[in-house]
Amino acid sequence: MQLNNLKPAAGSKHAKRRVGRGIGSGLGKTAGRGHKGQKSRSGGFHKVGFEGGQMPLHRRLPKRGFTSLTKEFTAEVRLGDLAGLPVAEIDLLTLKQAGLVGELVKSAKVILSGSIDKKVTLKGLGATAGAKAAIEAAGGSLA
């Protein structure tokens, strides 16, 4: 078997639909477009979302929500992920080096998800009330 001899399994590929190639093909003359009208013409079709003059759905529905500008600069870190780190003092740089937060992140918050049984100290990081309680119960602290 060589790369130049590879081909799809028999019957796995359908032949391309060749329209407008004679009446015997079943798709000759009008090529499956019917007679006259806008949709039979070349380039004759409405734009996406056009509903024939009726107010389109995307304009009938109200605007909703917004795009947060701070989303890419903030991050959440699970408490269970901190347990896997080899250091006892954890700050934003440590999280970036471990790949737990992205390079653009400027602030991170620890959330209560998973468990921690080792003593850790958080420096310059936020924590939810539950995460703070779990860290302090394990003998850790927030600086």
UniProtKB/Swiss-Prot annotation:
Q: Which domain of life is it from?
A: Bacteria
A molecular-function term among this protein's GO annotations: rRNA binding
The residue ranges flagged as biased composition, category Gly residues, are: 21-31
Which residues lie within the region annotated Disordered? 1-57
Output the HAMAP family linked to this UniProt entry: Ribosomal_uL15
**Pfam families of this UniProt entry?**
Ribosomal_L27A (PF00828)
This chain belongs to the protein called Large ribosomal subunit protein uL15
The role this protein plays is: Binds to the 23S rRNA.
Lineage from the top down? Bacteria, Pseudomonadati, Pseudomonadota, Betaproteobacteria, Burkholderiales
Q: Does the keyword Ribosomal protein apply?
A: yes
Q: Subunit details for this protein?
A: Part of the 50S ribosomal subunit.
Q: What is a biological process (GO) this protein takes part in?
A: translation
The cross-references to SUPFAM superfamilies, in alphabetical order and at most eight, read: Ribosomal proteins L15p and L18e
Q: Which family does it belong to?
A: Belongs to the universal ribosomal protein uL15 family.
Q: What does the UniProt keyword field contain? A: Ribonucleoprotein, Ribosomal protein, RNA-binding, rRNA-binding
Which GO CC annotations does the UniProt entry carry?
Answer: cytosolic large ribosomal subunit
Determine if ATP-binding is one of this entry's keywords: no
